Design a protein with these regions (language model features):
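Conserved pre-motif I regulatory segment
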Residues: 2-40
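Conserved helicase motor core of P-loop NTPases
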Residues: 5-6, 25-30, 37, 155-161, ...
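Short, conserved phosphate/pyrophosphate- and ester-handling motifs at nucleotide-, phospho-/glycolipid
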Residues: 22, 76, 272, 426
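C-terminal accessory regions
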Residues: 337-474
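ASCE P-loop NTPase helicase motor core
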Residues: 26-27, 31, 36-228, 232-235
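Short, solvent-exposed amphipathic alpha-helical segments in soluble enzyme
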Residues: 88, 283-287, 450-453
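Catalytic phosphate/metal-binding cores of nucleic-acid and nucleotide-processing enzymes, i.e., regions
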Residues: 39, 77, 333, 414, ...
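Conserved SAM-binding loop
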Residues: 18, 72, 268
Length: 474
């Protein structure tokens, strides 16, 4: 009876007749809500164009009307912003900012403990869950080093709190993992959970005229087939939202996109940091006419977590996370120290209501072919800064000096006009320029299809295929 009432309320909030798959998902969500097992969670998996985001937004709005408390989270700032917009403006947080707190300074970086979950009777909903990793490595400074483990531990530590994970299994899995563990029913059952899972595969009718979604759906269907052909053929005919751009027309076409939809809604997606660097330099020099290494108006992406500047400025956003985007407002005091180049920069954080922050940036990371400064560079910087305070007698005082040193805490950034697909994941742009470059014949077919699908689905209204091979078009 209660399930029927909740199903009806959810359906009414939907605004139009749901598809059969969406109706099943609504019914399952109602079953989940009335389920009394405290160790239960829900997975809502759906590919591009199936109405997954719309359904999640309906759930959030309906839960508000039903008096159910909800917390929205996503892996990146941009994804959290999109989740919030799709949910009627309900606040959304990045997972790291919600579940971790800074514990201690520990040499090269800080250490973060798992936060206490002080919520009660709350449903935690995580969008873009395909990006939630569970391997150690880059996350070593955070909690146990395994994000998914920590997320589950955090949520279920709260009284009567449960979790809903929403995502697309066809997207790229987290770096170093073969699949997305957070969307895998068996994996999540391994936490001792009763799992309510639903899948949305049918592209909703109003989206069927989209070439982006038509080809994304074809790519998803290819993932389950054993075929010898590595490179799939893209259908262009009859679709206004797909366009091939030869290399000699790229500058003009990018210029047109910047004029039509703006720089914030245009991005180049490519396969490597090296190619992203080439595109970023080409765009800055040729399209934007910028000769300085860094100047007002430049778009940047944070490539290493940094808590120092937000703490210093008492910012509400907690810390600057890998993947956060920012616009340069002013650049001052360029200087060389410790074998690296630095500058004081005023940033506008475009994923966080355009909050402004003054930081010191290490300029060397802008052009590095590595994802950020290398471990050797970070270690050398730490040791050089430590040597600056060699005359301070007490070790504890020396460490405090290093902890507050502007050079040691310099923000590591790259230009954000062109990014790798992993960096673009979790965001969408009106216009996406896709450069796949050379694909070696011995490449993993599965990896390539997931990469291509993820890249295709970053585009909202138009996808430009840069220098696309003729043998990949039908």
């Amino acid at each position: 009876m209660i399930t029927d009432e909740i199903t009806l309320r959810l359906t009414q909030c939907f605004g139009h007749k749901p598809t059969d798959e969406q109706a099943s998902a609504i019914r399952l969500f109602a079953d989940f809500l009335v389920n009394r097992n405290p160790h239960s969670l829900m997975l809502m998996r759906g590919s591009a164009g199936t109405g997954k985001s719309s359904l999640a937004g309906v759930f959030v709005r309906a839960l508000g009307l039903l008096g159910q408390k909800t917390v929205l989270m996503a892996p990146t700032g941009r994804a959290a912003k999109v989740f919030s917009l799709n949910s009627g403006g309900h606040a959304a947080f990045t997972i790291h900012r919600k579940i971790y707190r800074l514990r201690a300074f520990a040499g090269v970086g800080g250490e973060y403990n798992l936060n206490d979950n002080l919520h009660a009777d709350t449903l935690f909903m995580v969008d873009e869950a395909s990006m939630v990793a569970n391997g150690s490595g880059a996350e070593a400074a955070f909690g146990s080093g395994r994000l998914l483990d920590d997320l589950v531990r955090y949520v279920y530590a709260g009284r009567n709190c449960r979790l809903v994970l929403i995502g697309d299994q066809a997207q790229l899995p987290p770096v170093g993992e073969e699949q997305s563990p957070a969307l895998d029913t068996q994996f999540m059952q391994g936490y001792g959970m009763e799992v309510f899972a639903c899948d949305l595969n049918e592209v909703v009718r109003q989206q069927s005229a989209s070439g982006i979604l038509f080809n994304a759906t074809c790519l998803r269907q290819l993932m389950g087939r054993d075929e010898d052909t590595l490179l799939p053929r893209i259908r262009l005919e009859g679709f206004a939202d797909l366009q091939i751009v030869p290399g000699d027309e790229l500058i003009e076409t990018l210029n047109t996109s910047y004029a039509e939809v703006g720089m914030d809604e245009t991005i180049v997606v490519t396969r490597s940091n090296k190619r992203a660097n080439v595109f970023n330099q080409g765009i800055r020099n040729t399209v934007l006419g910028r000769e300085e290494l860094l100047t007002t108006g430049d778009l940047l992406m944070v490539v290493k977590n940094n808590y120092h500047w937000t703490e210093k400025e008492r910012s509400t956003i907690g810390f600057l996370a890998n993947g956060d985007r920012a616009r340069v407002m002013r650049v001052r005091n360029e200087q060389t120290a410790h074998g690296l180049r630095f500058a004081d920069v005023w940033l506008q954080l475009t994923d966080y209501e355009n909050e402004e922050l003054q930081v010191t940036v290490v300029l060397d990371s802008l052009l590095s072919e590595a994802p950020a400064l290398t471990a050797q560079q970070n270690e050398a910087l730490y040791n050089n800064v430590l040597n600056d305070y060699a005359d301070v007698p007490l070790k504890a005082d020396r460490m405090k000096m290093v902890k507050n040193d502007a050079f040691f805490n310099a923000l590591q950034v790259k230009f954000a006009y062109a990014v790798t697909c992993h960096k673009a994941q979790g965001g969408q742009w009106e216009h996406v320029f896709l450069d796949q470059g050379y694909v070696p014949e011995d490449s993993s077919r599965s990896d390539y299809l997931h990469w291509l699908y993820t890249a295709f689905t970053r585009a909202k209204s138009k996808l430009f295929l840069v220098n696309w091979p003729k043998n990949q078009v039908e």
